[in-house]
Structures are given as C-alpha cells and as structure tokens.
C-alpha cells in the first residue's frame, strides 16, 4: 500500500523541510532562478506553484495566506506586484526544472530551477568589459 508516500522527506525533520522550502521559495521568487539538487527542485514545485496561483488574484486574504507561507514581506510584494500579473493568462506550469549534471563533491544530481517567461537579464557594461 502507498499510504504516507505523499512527499519526499529528503532525510530532514518536518520543521527543517518547512524552513528549507520556505527559504528556497523566497529565493526563487526574489531571483526568479536558483540552482539546487534535483529532488529538492522537484519538491519545490509543489510549494511555489500554488503560491504563484495565489499571486494572480491580489485579495487581502490571498496576501495573508502567502505571507503565512513565505514569512518575507519583500517576496510577497513581488509575488503580487510582478509575478502574479505576469502569469494571469497561464493555468499552472509556472516553473521549469533543467538538469545540469552532477555536483563535484558528492555526485548529487543538480538542477537549475527558474520561472518560465521570466524577463531576459540584460548584460551590464562590466560583463562586456570582462570579456
């Protein structure tokens, strides 16, 4: 029977998992792309996608729900001001997980997680001068 197999435990306590995914969700919303291990990225989708769906409808109740889950005021403001309206016409599938090889030290599978349709980052003059 498959009872109790609803999520990946990732060898962490429930409070550690909650804090880790809260931090990762804030990082993803703030930077719109993060690098992490593949199992963490796959599990993070289950946290971030419902938050972006909340961000599409900026009611006070939705803002309070998002703040209760993220505990970061700047991330909630960005979620409702930028990210929610960007995905107003999209029904789910807001994130993309790209495999990027294995980590050098322990050979863990790594992944690059990003928001789809995110604006392209313009190269600065400092980057051009370095080349």
From Swiss-Prot:
Keyword annotations: Ribonucleoprotein, Ribosomal protein
GO MF term set: structural constituent of ribosome
Presence of keyword Ribonucleoprotein: yes
Top-level taxonomic group: Bacteria
GO cellular component, one term: cytosolic large ribosomal subunit
One GO BP: translation
UniProt cross-references to InterPro entries, sorted A to Z: Ribosomal_bL17, Ribosomal_bL17_CS, Ribosomal_bL17_sf
Cited Pfam families: Ribosomal_L17
Family statement: Belongs to the bacterial ribosomal protein bL17 family.
Assembly with partners or alone: Part of the 50S ribosomal subunit. Contacts protein L32.
Protein's name according to its UniProt entry: Large ribosomal subunit protein bL17
Organism field: Bordetella petrii (strain ATCC BAA-461 / DSM 12804 / CCUG 43448)
UniProt lineage: Bacteria, Pseudomonadati, Pseudomonadota, Betaproteobacteria, Burkholderiales
Gene name tied to this protein: rplQ
């Amino acid at each position: 029977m498959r009872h109790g197999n609803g999520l990946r435990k990732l060898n962490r306590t429930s409070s550690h998992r909650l804090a880790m995914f809260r931090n990762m969700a804030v990082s993803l919303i703030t930077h719109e792309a993060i690098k992490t291990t593949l199992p963490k990225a796959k599990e993070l989708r289950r946290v971030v996608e419902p938050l972006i769906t909340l961000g599409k409808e900026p009611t006070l109740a939705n803002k309070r729900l998002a703040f209760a889950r993220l505990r970061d005021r700047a991330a909630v403001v960005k979620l409702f001001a930028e990210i929610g309206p960007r995905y107003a016409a999209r029904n789910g599938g807001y994130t993309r997980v790209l495999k990027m090889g294995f980590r050098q030290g322990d050979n863990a599978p790594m992944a690059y997680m990003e928001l789809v349709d995110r604006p392209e980052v313009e190269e600065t003059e400092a980057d051009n001068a370095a080349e």
